[in-house]
Structures are given as C-alpha cells and as structure tokens.
Design a protein with these regions (language model features):
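Short beta-strand elements that form the blades of beta-propeller/WD-repeat-like
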Residues: 18-33, 40, 69-83, 97, ...
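Hydrophilic extracytoplasmic domains
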Residues: 170-211
C-alpha cells in the first residue's frame, strides 16, 4: 500500500533540541551546543528551511518561547535562583539583536501534544497488549483522524530505546527508533499542528511529515 505520510523535511539541527514554537506559517526550533544557541526556522506548509542562525548575544538564561510578527519572543530569567522573575523581549533572528521588552506575553498558538501514560498508570497494560511488546517506563499516545501516533520504550541491558509508531486504520505504516542509549523517560517525543507531525530523532534530526 502507498505510504499515507509525506515527509516534507528531514534536517540535522546544529545542536540538541531545546525548545520549539509554531504559528500559522512557521515552526522555529531552538537547539543548543555548549553555551551557543541556534535557531532554525522552517516553513510549515512546505517544510523548507528558511533561516538558520547562531546567536552570539544570548546566554543560557535566554529561551525561545514564542513568535510575534517577524521576531522571536525570548524569555530571560533575571534572577537565576528565582525562575518566577522572568522578562520577555523581541529578538531579531537575522541581526542577533534584542529588541523591545514586552509588557505582556501570552502564547496563544498551541500545538497538540500526545497523552502521557506512565508505567504506573492503570491503562499501561493495555498499551503493552496493543503494541505487543514488553514496553517500559511510559508511552505517549495521540489519535489523529484514522491515525494513531505513539512513542514507547524498550529496555536493552541498562539502557532504553524509544520508538515511534504510526498506524492508519489500525495498520502499522511507520515504526522506527527515535532515540537510543537513554537512561530514563522523557516526555515530548512528538507533536501535531495543522496536519503536520513533528518530531526529532537522535536529539538532532528534525522531521516534518504531512499527515
């Protein structure tokens, strides 16, 4: 049968994934290497990479939290011992400049995240039966029309492998390793937004699928 998914983009990020934000036309990824921050901007419709930059001005205490017009919204923790004290600034990705401070920030564009089921959940044995493998730690599950998207963990020696599985009309069309060598469970394996499935493999390989 033909694959009901269309891969729009697979791109190796310059660092490990740290944050992601979306609006109606773009998705922007923040990745990090040591003290450096990198921003990768993709067109949501085509999946094409529009712009990728490395900041020379932002510190580890600056984080990507939103988009406003052509600017990124950056959160800055003023007091490193008190995370409640934070301010928000507009940031120009092209010029690497902090712009105006925002008096108010609310992220109104939300992507859809899967439901989390930890191993202690009473429903977890049902997922073990459904996947037909001895899964551990937890799984993330989302239904999207006639599609089921889920990530699950398998134990190999003292480490864990996370796999991503996609079913259409209850038939498996995708089942691949998403990460290996893990030491525990980490949520946020994938999300969906406007008929797009978005996930990262091996901490750096960014993928956009049309679903």
């Amino acid at each position: 049968m033909p694959n009901p998914f269309s891969k729009l983009q697979s791109h190796s990020l310059p660092g490990n994934l740290f944050a992601s934000v979306v609006n109606d036309s773009q998705i922007i990824i923040e990745s990090r290497t040591n003290e450096k921050k990198h921003f990768s901007t993709f067109d949501l419709k085509s999946g094409n990479l529009i712009l990728e930059t490395t900041s020379q001005t932002l510190t580890p205490w600056h984080s990507l939290v939103g988009i406003k017009n052509q600017y990124l919204i950056i959160q800055y923790f003023e007091n490193k011992k008190n995370p409640d004290l934070a301010s928000h600034f507009l940031y120009n990705q092209q010029t690497d400049e902090m712009m105006d401070e925002l008096n108010y920030f609310s992220n109104t564009t939300q992507f859809s995240i899967p439901t989390l089921y930890l191993s202690e959940s009473p429903d977890f044995p049902l997922f073990q039966q459904f996947i037909d493998q001895k899964i551990v730690l937890g799984c993330e599950y989302q239904e999207y029309g006639n599609k089921i998207i889920m990530s699950y963990y398998l134990q190999v020696s003292n480490e864990y492998i996370r796999r991503l599985r996609i079913l259409v009309d209850r038939k498996i069309v995708y089942d691949e390793v998403q990460d290996d060598g893990l030491t525990g469970f980490a949520p946020g394996s994938f999300f969906t937004f406007k008929n797009r499935l978005i996930f990262v493999q091996d901490k750096k390989e960014f993928n956009i699928y049309e679903i």
